[in-house]
Amino acid sequence: IAEPSSGLRSAATAVACGQIVADGPLADRIEQIVSTGHATLARPVLRQLARTDVPIIHIGDRSTFPAVAGPNVKFVPAVTAAGRGDENWLRSWIESGDRFASALLAAEPLTVARAVWDAAADGLLVVGSSNPIRDLNLVAPVRLTGPQVLANRGLAGIDGTVSTAIGAALTFWGRSIALMGDLTFLHGANGLLIGPAEPRPDLTIVVLNDDGGG
């Protein structure tokens, strides 16, 4: 299960709509969890990481683990696979996620998030907090090469997203797109003030009408 900004959604084992699958019957059969990075987006994933009834191995330290770490949580610098796992187990997760993904693509405004992801293609995609990043978490495709994704941590903070996108675009070699909600855009609109001697980025900003966030 990989968040949009993790850089791992293109992995061959990535699960679409993983947060939905992790809240279903397959989750009851989990025997061990391995996590890396700092998961923050989906409550079902956070609930899995807060479990005390299965061993959890986190690649990293406590600063990147999003739950209270009980005695079942082990922090390690790296892991090595002991061998190939049960391919039927992986297939059941992938097929379940793909079914959810197909159903969700017909829903607005999720189609907007998917269209922006596709438009970014091999470029840079900067994503604002609240609904946009969560929409992408549902509909951004997996097991396919996608854009480089940047998203500010915290997800409750929206100030400075426009400036973040401009700064990132200025350092990127290709086209850049930013997707953000209406309130996020308003809170960062002063970042659009670019002086006459300052460089201008190749940046498209897409503002999602999400009624001030969700």
Where on the chain are the PLM-derived regions?
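Gly/Ser/Thr-rich loops at beta-strand to alpha-helix junctions
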Residues: 1, 38-41, 129-134, 156-157, ...
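Redox- and metal-dependent alpha/beta enzyme cores, enriched for Fe-S-associated oxidoreductases
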Residues: 1-11, 123, 133-140, 202, ...
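Generic beta-strand/beta-sheet core signal
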Residues: 2-3, 36, 59, 126-130, ...
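Glycine-rich, acidic loop regions that bind phosphate or pyrophosphate groups
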Residues: 2-100, 195, 209-211
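Structural motif
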Residues: 32, 124, 175-177
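A short acidic, amphipathic alpha-helical/loop segment
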Residues: 44-49, 115-116, 138-139, 191-195
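Active-site diphosphate/adenylate-binding microenvironment
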Residues: 90-172
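Thiamine diphosphate
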Residues: 140-214
